[in-house]
Structures are given as structure tokens and as C-alpha cells.
Amino acid sequence: MPVEQYLALDDTTDGLYEYWHGLVLMLRPPSSVSLEEAFVDMAGGSPTHAALSARLASLIDQGLPQDSLCVVYSSDVRLKLAEDHYLHPDVTVSCTEQAEGVLTHPTVIIEVLSPNTEKRDRSAKLTAYKALPSLQEYLLIGSEEKEIIVYRRENDWRPYHYNEGDSVELASLGVSFPFDAVYRRIRLA
């Protein structure tokens, strides 16, 4: 599918789609399609996935200084990696002004792992995101087990694993939050 068709599809339906070098991946079917009709494996979609995404966005937003220029975005906002590559990360934080309707300069990207996306989030997306000059930190959040991994540009993208009782540090934002707060009252899948 040409990129123009993808952009029209993503802009004109209430479904959510990613565009990976010519391939369209459905993340959320449009409301006009029943789940039985949506025969492709969709990303996320579980209550656990949604709760973790919302919790992380809230913890980061609450931790930002009042005078911060950073804005926290949900997966509803499209991220442009290249002319033929658009994704919808679960949570994106950008600290620079963005064009209307599309993010291009993320500072932090968060993906909540699910069985359908984990391999892609840990490999292909990690590689693609690392190529973004503005990106400073990439987080992977477990939805089946308590797991938080942070990759940092300043650390040559080596993974840092956080555990229960730790304080998760997002140095690029000057934000920290308790590991345990991420999973509080959330039942894992």
C-alpha cells in the first residue's frame, strides 16, 4: 500500500494502524468491524495493556517539572520514523514542538509488551527507534510478568533491568517513579 493510502486510512477511521515499509499492521480495528472480522493479530488490546500504558503516562506526566516543555502522548498519536515508516508507540514523550498530527522528535518511547508484539518490540522496533537522533530512552514494560527495561542512548543502548523496590529513572526527563507504582492494583495477563 502506498504511504498516502495508509495516511488516509489512519486519519479517516477510528481504527489504529502502523505502517512498516509498505505493510499496514492493524493495532485496533475500526468500530465498524467486529473482533471476529478482525482476523489479524492486534497489538495490545488487553485491559492490562491499557492500564499499564495509562499508568506510565500518568507517572511521567506527574513527575515532570511545572515549567517542562515535555508532553506525554498516548498511542493515538502517530510517530513518523521515515517517509515509509509510521508507528503508534504505547506512550511517547516529546520535549520539542511537534507538527500537527504527527510526532517526529520523541525523547522517550514506551512499549508495553504483549504476546503478539514482544518479539517486534524487543528487536525491530528497538533498532528503528535507536536510529532517531532525538530519542534518549526506550522502555519495555512487561504485561505478563513484572519487568521494566530501559535502554539509554548515553549507555550505548545497553539494557538496564529494574526490579521490585527500585526507583525507575528517566534521566532525559529528570523523572523517577517507583517500580511498584507501575504495577499497583494492575492484574497481569
Task: Please report, for each region that a protein language model flagged, where it lies by residue.
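Gly/Pro/Ser/Thr-rich low-complexity, intrinsically disordered segments predominantly at protein N-termini
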Residues: M1-A189
